[in-house]
A protein has these predicted regions:
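Generic detector of isolated residues embedded in canonical secondary-structure elements
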Residues: 17, 141, 209-210, 299, ...
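Bacterial Sec-dependent N-terminal signal peptides
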Residues: 1-19, 331, 395
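Phosphate/pyrophosphate-recognition segments in soluble nucleotide-handling domains
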Residues: 2, 323-335
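Hydrophobic alpha-helical membrane-insertion segments
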Residues: 11, 221-223, 310, 354, ...
Length: 408
C-alpha cells in the first residue's frame, strides 16, 4: 500500500507577483546577507504601529496563500513578494520571499516561506547574520534542505542603529562596555517586523517550533553548543535535548550545555530574547523573562569551527533538524500523468478522482491542517465535493491498494 499526494486548486488564479526569479535560493539569500548594512550607519529604524498592522495583514495573506492581496498590502511598506523557483532542487521548489525593494530604506529583514513545506511546523530564525558569522548562510542551507515552513533573517548588523532598545538586558557586543541592546538587534526589540512575524506564525501555526541560530566565541570552559528554551523549565517535548542527541549522531566530539538541564549554567542562555519571551508567554515580552516553557522556542549558540564554518558543519545541523522534525505531510515523487487524474482542476465544487481501489481520501491546506477526510470501500473514480472550502491550494492524499506508482 502506498500513499499518493496530489496538489490541486480550488478555482483561484493569481496575478503576476511583484517579482519572479529562479536559481539557487542559497546563493540568492547569501548575496542579500553579504550586502546588508554593517555595524554602523544607523540604517535601521523601527516600523510604526500602522506599518506593523499592515505587515501583519501581509503575513496573514501569505499564510493563506493570498499572494495578490499580500503584494498589494506590502507595496506601501517598500517591500515586495518575490516568487522564487529553486532549480537546484529536484523537483524544483517554489519559495515566497518577502524582501525589501532596492529603493526602500526599510531594513526590516527578509522572510522566506515554502510554498509546499515538508516540515510545516519548523521555523528557522537568524537575527544576527553579520555578527554571528555564517548563521544566516547556515540558516538558509538548513531551510532549503529541510524544506521548513519559514525562515527569518535580519536586515542589518545587530549594532547598526545608534539608538537603544527599551527592552531589558545588556551586552558588550557593540563596544563601549556593557550597555543596552541596540534597536537593530532584532532578538532584543519588540517593535520589529521580526517580532511581529514571530507572533503571527506562533499564533496561527499551532504546533510551530522556532529554532534560532546564533554563534559565539568559545572560551576554554565552554562547550561547543549552548542551548536553551528560554527558561529553566523542562517542557513536555524537550526539543533541545532531542536536537542535542541528533547532533551527537552527526559529530560525537560535540559538547553541550542546556540551560534547563544544568540550571547553574548562565552564559548565553537567551533569557532576554524577546522572541523567546513571546513564545513562552511572558507577561512582558520586552522586560520580563518567562518562567515556564511552551517548548516551542530553541535558542542555539554554536562555536564556529564545528557547526558554522562551512557547509560541512551546516549539514550536521540540517541533518539533526531533519531527524527531530519529521515530515508533516509525506509527499513522494510520482509521475502524476501515469498515476491518476483530477478534474476539473481548478474546480468550483466537485472533483473527480480517476483512480482505482481508493479506500481513503484526505485533504490538507497549506498549513498542513486536515480539512477533509472520507473513507470508501475500495471504490473506483470517487467524486468529492469542495464547495464548502475556501479558495486556495490543497494537497490531496489518496490511499489505495492498486494505484499505479511511478517513482522518478
Amino acid at each position: 500500500m502506498k500513499n499518493l499526494v496530489l496538489i490541486f486548486l480550488i478555482f483561484v488564479t493569481f496575478s503576476s507577483f511583484s517579482q519572479i526569479s529562479s536559481g539557487n535560493i542559497e546563493n540568492y539569500i547569501a548575496n542579500y546577507i553579504d550586502n546588508v548594512p554593517g555595524n554602523s550607519g544607523n540604517d535601521y529604524a523601527d516600523p510604526n504601529n500602522s506599518q506593523l498592522a499592515t505587515w501583519n495583514t501581509v503575513i496573514d495573506n501569505l499564510l493563506a496563500n493570498n499572494l495578490t492581496n499580500a503584494r498589494n498590502f506590502v507595496n506601501s511598506l517598500g517591500y515586495q513578494v518575490t516568487e522564487f523557483t529553486d532549480t537546484s532542487i529536484s523537483p524544483n521548489q517554489i519559495f515566497y520571499i518577502l524582501e525589501k525593494k532596492t529603493s526602500s530604506s526599510n531594513y526590516w529583514g527578509t522572510y522566506v516561506f515554502s510554498k509546499t513545506p515538508t516540515r510545516n511546523n519548523l521555523i528557522l530564525q537568524a537575527p544576527h547574520i553579520k555578527y554571528d558569522t555564517n548563521t544566516g548562510k547556515q540558516a538558509i542551507f538548513c531551510f532549503k534542505n529541510t524544506l521548513a515552513r519559514a525562515l527569518f533573517i535580519s536586515g542589518t548588523h545587530r549594532c547598526n542603529s545608534s539608538s537603544f532598545s527599551s527592552c531589558s538586558g545588556t551586552t558588550s557586543t557593540c563596544g563601549s562596555g556593557s550597555q543596552s541592546y541596540k534597536k537593530s538587534d532584532l532578538a532584543h526589540n519588540v517593535t520589529t517586523m521580526f517580532q511581529k512575524t514571530t507572533e503571527n506564525l506562533f499564533t496561527n501555526i499551532s504546533n510551530s517550533v522556532f529554532i534560532q541560530l546564533h554563534g559565539f566565541g568559545k572560551k576554554s570552559s565552554d562547550p561547543y553548543v549552548i542551548m536553551s528554551n528560554g527558561t529553566r523549565d523542562t517542557p513536555a517535548t524537550d526539543y533541545a535535548s532531542l536536537i542535542k542527541n541528533k547532533l551527537l549522531n552527526e559529530d560525537s566530539s560535540l559538547t553541550f550545555q542546556i540551560a534547563h538541564i544544568n540550571k547553574s549554567w548562565t552564559r548565553l542562555i537567551g533569557f532576554t530574547n524577546t522572541q523567546g519571551r513571546l513564545i513562552n508567554n511572558s507577561s512582558n515580552h520586552c522586560n520580563t523573562s518567562a518562567s515556564s516553557s511552551t517548548g516551542r522556542f530553541i535558542h542555539i549558540e554554536q562555536e564556529k569551527l564545528k557547526l558554522r564554518n562551512d557547509s560541512n558543519g551546516w549539514t550536521k545541523m540540517s541533518n539533526a533538524l531533519k531527524s527531530v522534525f519529521q515530515s508533516t505531510l509525506s509527499i513522494e515523487k510520482y509521475n502524476l500523468n501515469e498515476v491518476v487524474s483530477v478534474s476539473p482542476n481548478p474546480t468550483f465544487d466537485k472533483v473527480l478522482i480517476s483512480a482505482k481501489d481508493v479506500f481513503q481520501i484526505e485533504v490538507y491546506n497549506l498549513l498542513g491542517q486536515k480539512v477533509f477526510q472520507k473513507k470508501f470501500n475500495k471504490v473506483n473514480n470517487p467524486i468529492i465535493n469542495f464547495i464548502s472550502q475556501s479558495k486556495g491550494i490543497y494537497f490531496l492524499n489518496l490511499r489505495g491498494n492498486s494505484i499505479k506508482l511511478v517513482k522518478n
